[in-house]
A protein has these predicted regions:
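Membrane-embedded transmembrane alpha-helical bundles that form the catalytic cores
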Residues: 1-150
Length: 150
């Protein structure tokens, strides 16, 4: 039973490629619960997946076209356009990463499995430290958990 639980945890498809970085304690309560699929979970999961697809495909992918055009031929653009492209790239990066996280969390949510959130409005942070605590939260927790190991 223990081997099966560990194998399921390590091979859990929504987090294996994209994240979020999960600890055993984060998911064991819902990952191993034999619960039937509920309409509420399916609705919430689908909503989160669609929101993630919107962020990734509509916002991030469209910004990528503009940013790539400026970055490839930056010498022919003014400083203001390059600054706008840099800001757009920051938004693109966030929308792509958080959109993928929304899809992962939504996919797990379809089955009633709760995964930790990975973003908490990082661009509203007032300090660099606060930004780091809000951006890729699970990576920060992973580093914090291992600081005594290193």
């Amino acid at each position: 039973m223990l081997f099966r639980s560990i194998a399921l945890f390590l091979g859990f498809f929504p987090v294996i490629v994209e994240g979020p970085i999960c600890r055993w304690e984060d998911v064991e309560g819902t990952l191993f619960k034999n619960e039937s699929v509920k309409a509420e979970n399916v609705f919430k999961g689908c909503y989160r997946i669609i929101w993630g697809l919107f962020k990734k495909m509509i916002i991030a992918d469209r910004l990528a076209v503009l940013v790539d055009k400026v970055y490839v031929g930056y010498e022919s653009y003014s400083g203001a356009v390059i600054v706008a492209a840099a800001i757009s790239y920051t938004i693109q990066l966030y929308m792509e990463f958080s959109g993928c996280m929304d899809m992962v969390i939504g996919s797990a949510g379809l089955f009633g499995i709760r995964l930790p959130e990975n973003f908490s409005q990082p661009f509203f942070a007032k300090t660099c430290t606060d930004f780091w605590k809000r951006w890729h939260i699970t990576l920060g927790v992973w580093f914090k958990d291992r600081k005594s190991v290193v």
